[in-house]
């Protein structure tokens, strides 16, 4: 199992349970049944490496959720997974939510596992780049 948390957000409990069942041996999985619950989990438990959100949920849609997550936790890699797609939804998700991947349901376990491996690699790159930049800045300040 990886040390990186992945948060799945979907208003359909059976989908969350299926993801957890398929992936729990390999990944550290957290789940939320709404965008509001996801934000609360992140507030209490801290950021996760990857968030996978459904698009259409009551209260707050996935684009709004991922936009807030990006503002609060810029290192978190974001994935949109939805059964209902149209061009405007995809464009809004990419432009507003700055997502890593936009995928449609259903998605097979092998494809999902591969996607999550890629997302964790992206998270590692983001955090390593920021750490390197921080160390470079500290070194520059010390030289001055």
Language model feature labels by segment:
Residues 10, 54, 82:
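Active-site residues of response regulator receiver
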Residues 115-144:
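Acidic/His-rich, divalent-metal-binding segments that scaffold phosphate/diphosphate chemistry
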Residues 85-88, 106-116:
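C-terminal output helix
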Residues 4, 13-31:
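Two-component/phosphorelay signaling modules centered on CheY-like receiver
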Residues 13-14, 31-40, 62:
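Helix N-cap/capping motif at the beta->alpha junctions
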Residues 40, 63-75, 92-95:
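Short amphipathic alpha-helix used as the core "switch/output" element in two-component signaling
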Residues 46-52:
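Active-site beta3 strand of CheY-like receiver
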Residues 57:
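Receiver (REC) domain active-site loop signature in two-component systems and cognate sites
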């Amino acid at each position: 199992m990886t040390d990186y948390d992945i948060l799945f957000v979907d208003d359909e409990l059976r989908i969350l349970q299926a993801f957890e069942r398929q992936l729990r041996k390999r990944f550290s999985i957290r789940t939320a049944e709404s965008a509001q619950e996801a934000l609360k989990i992140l507030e209490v438990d801290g950021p996760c490496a990857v968030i996978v959100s459904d698009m259409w949920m009551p209260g707050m849609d996935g684009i709004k959720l991922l936009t807030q997550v990006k503002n609060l936790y810029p290192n978190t890699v974001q994935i949109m997974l939805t059964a209902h797609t149209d061009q405007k939804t995809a464009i809004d998700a990419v432009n507003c939510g700055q997502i890593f991947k936009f995928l449609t349901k259903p998605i097979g376990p092998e494809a999902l596992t591969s996607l999550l491996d890629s997302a964790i690699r992206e998270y590692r790159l983001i955090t390593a780049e920021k750490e390197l930049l921080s160390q470079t800045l500290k070194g520059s300040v010390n030289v001055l």
